[in-house]
């Protein structure tokens, strides 16, 4: 059943010649049941501010607007703007379109004077999804400018985001996510839901910021985790050699023969707080 009276997405794509560009990490989401499910996962968004990154032809955008959200859409691909403007006509005063590279966008300033924090809800372009997430996780000050994030990633990336210590997917991204937020995989999305269909399954991840994460410099924790996971199979005394190696680990009370994937987030925080 249509969620609005706008033309079907396939028709929109044909009208505006919006073939997905691999160089932009684009995979357009066509399944209206799934776009509505993503919007629903973010909670009650009626009358609430929402940031969407990479709306493309506007499939998820329409689902967000249909649920009453006030959407700010960041789209780098100028080809998509006319299609998004057609949606804006259908939802006056509800959709703001910004043509910009999301990696260059200062998101915190978009809602500086707003009484409510926005929710970030997006089918992120595959080629910038991880970097965008890191930018939002390491944002200062904390608590951040957003209330929550409901984001689609490649399944493997989603597993890395939510992984626990001692697991195959546990790494730097897991630590930085778990330090400042609570993240869970909400549901998977099959390849056939997209045009073009990717070769892998995707997953929607719901992320809620912690109000009081363990005290630590984001910059230092980012650096320590990057160094510790640099060569996964090596012991920490080797990987952390440039940061003090055995001396640093002894101060932290951590066995020098352990590997990075065995450390709890709190232990990484201890290491980061000891780094000068």
From Swiss-Prot:
GO cellular component, one term: cytosol
Keyword Hydrolase part of the UniProt annotation: no
Molecular-function annotations in GO: 16S rRNA (adenine(1518)-N(6)/adenine(1519)-N(6))-dimethyltransferase activity; RNA binding
Domain of life from the UniProt record: Bacteria
Residues annotated as binding S-adenosyl-L-methionine: 27, 29, 54, 75, 101, 123
Intrachain disulfide bonds: none
UniProt-listed Pfam families: RrnaAD
Enzyme Commission number, as recorded: 2.1.1.182
Catalytic activity: adenosine(1518)/adenosine(1519) in 16S rRNA + 4 S-adenosyl-L-methionine = N(6)-dimethyladenosine(1518)/N(6)-dimethyladenosine(1519) in 16S rRNA + 4 S-adenosyl-L-homocysteine + 4 H(+)
SMART domains named in the record: rADc
Compartments reported by the entry: Cytoplasm
Assigned keywords, A-Z: Cytoplasm, Methyltransferase, RNA-binding, rRNA processing, S-adenosyl-L-methionine, Transferase
Methyltransferase among keywords: yes
Family to which the UniProt record says this protein belongs: Belongs to the class I-like SAM-binding methyltransferase superfamily. rRNA adenine N(6)-methyltransferase family. RsmA subfamily.
Purpose of the protein: Specifically dimethylates two adjacent adenosines (A1518 and A1519) in the loop of a conserved hairpin near the 3'-end of 16S rRNA in the 30S particle. May play a critical role in biogenesis of 30S subunits.
Protein name: Ribosomal RNA small subunit methyltransferase A
Gene: rsmA
